[in-house]
Amino acid sequence: MAELATIARPYAEALFRVAKAADLNSWANLVSEMAQVAANPDVYALAHNPKVSDDLISSTFISALKSPVGAEAKNFINMLVQNDRLTLLPEIATQFHALKNAQEGAADAEIVSAFELSSAQLTELVATLEKKFGRKLNPTVTVDGALIGGVRVVVGDEVLDTSVRAKLQQMQVALTA
């Protein structure tokens, strides 16, 4: 895994420099979409098929994208295909978004809730979490009924677990100690 990160880093940094000079948010959306397409097993098989030309791989990949693809993005995709690095796009996207978050002073927040959150609840929760963590958060919300109640929040390497399940586990540890 560390090897993939090492290989992907220069690509992510170069792409980030290009995106900074243009519209960073539209590039971030395009990079996310490219990563999703590249993660598809059919794309992996196509990219590693020696009978398929680089031009065909590039054009097929570009046609699979819903977002408009500019000249810089086409050049980037062509370069990845020529260097057999197209399947690195998910890791490149991860590093690209980390660079974007660092520039914006933001962080990705993975919020796991026991129940579906309304938009008002989510807005209030994110505002509270932004105060606690001291930076802007980009939330991703999932629902896990196993939490019983409450939420579990992961921001970078920090975890805030206020779920009922976590409280029960703490009580179990305290009672068995």
From Swiss-Prot:
SUPFAM superfamilies per the record?
N-terminal domain of the delta subunit of the F1F0-ATP synthase
An annotated GO cellular component of this protein is: proton-transporting ATP synthase complex
* Membrane topology label: Peripheral membrane protein
Report TM segments: none
GO terms, molecular function: proton-transporting ATP synthase activity, rotational mechanism
Q: Does the keyword Translocase apply?
A: no
Q: Which Pfam families match?
A: OSCP
Cell membrane: present as a keyword of the record?
yes
Places the protein is found: Cell inner membrane
Q: What is its main location?
A: membrane
Q: What Gene3D superfamilies would the database entry show? A: N-terminal domain of the delta subunit of the F1F0-ATP synthase
Which keywords appear in this protein's UniProt record, sorted alphabetically? Answer: ATP synthesis, Cell inner membrane, Cell membrane, CF(1), Hydrogen ion transport, Ion transport, Membrane, Transport
Assembly and interactions? Answer: F-type ATPases have 2 components, F(1) - the catalytic core - and F(0) - the membrane proton channel. F(1) has five subunits: alpha(3), beta(3), gamma(1), delta(1), epsilon(1). F(0) has three main subunits: a(1), b(2) and c(10-14). The alpha and beta chains form an alternating ring which encloses part of the gamma chain. F(1) is attached to F(0) by a central stalk formed by the gamma and epsilon chains, while a peripheral stalk is formed by the delta and b chains.
Which family does the UniProt entry place this protein in? Belongs to the ATPase delta chain family.
What is the role of this chain? Answer: F(1)F(0) ATP synthase produces ATP from ADP in the presence of a proton or sodium gradient. F-type ATPases consist of two structural domains, F(1) containing the extramembraneous catalytic core and F(0) containing the membrane proton channel, linked together by a central stalk and a peripheral stalk. During catalysis, ATP synthesis in the catalytic domain of F(1) is coupled via a rotary mechanism of the central stalk subunits to proton translocation. This protein is part of the stalk that links CF(0) to CF(1). It either transmits conformational changes from CF(0) to CF(1) or is implicated in proton conduction.
- Could you identify this protein by its name? ATP synthase subunit delta
Supply the source organism for this entry. Janthinobacterium sp. (strain Marseille) (Minibacterium massiliensis)
Q: Tell me the organism's taxonomic lineage.
A: Bacteria, Pseudomonadati, Pseudomonadota, Betaproteobacteria, Burkholderiales
Q: In the UniProt record, what gene is named as encoding this protein?
A: atpH
